[in-house]
Amino acid sequence: MMDGPRSDVGRWGGNPLQPPTTPSPEPEPEPDGRSRRGGGRSFWARCCGCCSCRNAADDDWGPEPSDSRGRGSSSGTRRPGSRGSDSRRPVSRGSGVNAAGDGTIREGMLVVNGVDLLSSRSDQNRREHHTDEYEYDELIVRRGQPFHMLLLLSRTYESSDRITLELLIGNNPEVGKGTHVIIPVGKGGSGGWKAQVVKASGQNLNLRVHTSPNAIIGKFQFTVRTQSDAGEFQLPFDPRNEIYILFNPWCPEDIVYVDHEDWRQEYVLNESGRIYYGTEAQIGERTWNYGQFDHGVLDACLYILDRRGMPYGGRGDPVNVSRVISAMVNSLDDNGVLIGNWSGDYSRGTNPSAWVGSVEILLSYLRTGYSVPYGQCWVFAGVTTTVLRCLGLATRTVTNFNSAHDTDTSLTMDIYFDENMKPLEHLNHDSVWNFHVWNDCWMKRPDLPSGFDGWQVVDATPQETSSGIFCCGPCSVESIKNGLVYMKYDTPFIFAEVNSDKVYWQRQDDGSFKIVYVEEKAIGTLIVTKAISSNMREDITYLYKHPEGSDAERKAVETAAAHGSKPNVYANRGSAEDVAMQVEAQDAVMGQDLMVSVMLINHSSSRRTVKLHLYLSVTFYTGVSGTIFKETKKEVELAPGASDRVTMPVAYKEYRPHLVDQGAMLLNVSGHVKESGQVLAKQHTFRLRTPDLSLTLLGAAVVGQECEVQIVFKNPLPVTLTNVVFRLEGSGLQRPKILNVGDIGGNETVTLRQSFVPVRPGPRQLIASLDSPQLSQVHGVIQVDVAPAPGDGGFFSDAGGDSHLGETIPMASRGGA
């Protein structure tokens, strides 16, 4: 972890440019996921409402942690979990015990000799529950929907026999908390649980089991009890009979229900997606492998809930679950999944731009218990999408361009300048991120008034604390749209991200500050996500805000601001404007020269004289700017109704020494109109584009058969790229793989080939990235249509194969520019 959440260079305004301290490894966790490290309160201890650990600010965290740990058999998540072959599991058998516990089986006793949960991926249960893609042998079902099982009995089932199914989760299962579920066969259970005999044939009994639509999600132990005139029998617990229960967007009684099949296919079942980055004018996109069905990922998701002891009784509520996930995907407070790092120094971990998916990250966390270095907003969001989709919540990854970060709850973005309109960086704690990525997940909100169901924002990037914890959401998108910042959770912060105003303050001669300009359309200018059933970009800005400048939009802003720390900010507005300013930057590729320009337009009927000042600096995508490396001053005369353009060329050699992550630059433009006193102010962010990787499939792809992909890359820079690392990942195609390829010369073209063995049929995506100290944010993707294996059900039995990390690969060929 970093020195402190506000010490990260590139993340918070006003920080010196210094390398981060290297995080010390967390202590190895115990097998149940708890850390050996003593001291400090756990996540749920800080968040619960019990008398011994209550925090007055912690009312938002839901149920008390009354499910104690420490006795009984646990059904917590095992590491690393079972492998994912699709071979038919044998019927589990056990000797069982009678009511006396002595193991004696009496004549006439109804003994359960075996159980078949019909858990194969090709069986009816998995297909009907839309869980057949999970690379697991265990039964995985969605709550509120029936499933079938077969019992192999010692004799014919009689009407006088009584059979009871039991599901248990946690170390201290209790009926009253829903952690011990008792289901009498043939009788109505409580809370929607019931079991019925479908068919009795000889010693075989076919049962249909109905789960509650409000059931706790997680991995349950399963047992069967029988009672007959000859005595009672209990089937012993068998790990092969553990049952995973997930949220169910297909069940109308589940509060996560989604009433559109195409939405469910996209937001629950799609294993890959697009994440957008860059600037509004220069949008980049990268394909992300969510991999929610990959072997081990479901165990990793449940391990996240276990890691800091989320009460099992609260795991049936998607509001609580999503809020915990938003806290645990980042490492602050609770040693969660990812360590955030915005410094530019990633020498002790992985550059956030190098990740191509969530699988490698989650499996590393599950395997070691250590937080994974490093992540930034799109990585946190990508992992959150994986976790929530895996658990059954319809979730999408959302990008907000020109995303504000309000640090003082004013609900405005305050930017301070000196008397000459030069930015005062030590005062500019608020920042506008070029883009910020979070998540929407779909659920009803019974904890809110009516009208706030549907999409809810969840943000795992650690920006500000909520109830003392670095987490954010779930927050109703509808409350954001209408400026209802008093609705929980964290609505003021998210509203400011999408719909605050940019307020420019100038220092006066007496040291005070005066508002000289308010930019009303600068924040949340475009909010996008991947479209359903395509790789196109969908504009969802209208869901978050009313049309810019409309009465409804202004009312929402002013309503929100009235609840902020500067409720009277709109009482002091600047003078009328008659000179307009437009800022542009030439679209350029990393390594090329570029041009920036400012257009001035005189809308008045009089001559105007404008003193213009341009400051150019590099900037982190978080809005934190570096040193100003070029500036230009010019006085422009404008005739009535005339316009003029001021340009500033920038050579590669001028910006190269100053480049930071994302290749972004910030142009601060300020001006003063001599005749009217009008102040002009504008901040314009742009980025240098990076090249893509070119991927080509060599031959047909068939389940279980080796095929090959070719990757081609041309270095756009005139300098050598050192310590180049490729990453390759694709659900159903390739477990996460790291390829160390050494150096690539300036303007050199390289080609490499990699083989892989598909394990699941259907359309798949193979994703690759390149990273080096000199160049990052380079990635590529190829669609791979995998044919089923001849004469097979389609699945290959090596789905749980190991990842290939740290392999050194020779180049297939090299070429010059």
From Swiss-Prot:
Domain of life where this protein originates? Eukaryota
* Biological function: Catalyzes the cross-linking of proteins and the conjugation of polyamines to proteins. Responsible for cross-linking epidermal proteins during formation of the stratum corneum. Involved in cell proliferation.
Task: Give the primary localization class.
Answer: membrane
Classify the protein's membrane topology as the record does.
Answer: Lipid-anchor
Report the protein name in the record. Protein-glutamine gamma-glutamyltransferase K
State which gene encodes it: TGM1
Q: Which UniProt keywords apply?
A: Acyltransferase, Calcium, Disease variant, Ichthyosis, Keratinization, Lipoprotein, Membrane, Metal-binding, Palmitate, Phosphoprotein, Transferase
Q: Which residues of this protein are catalytic?
A: C377, H436, D459
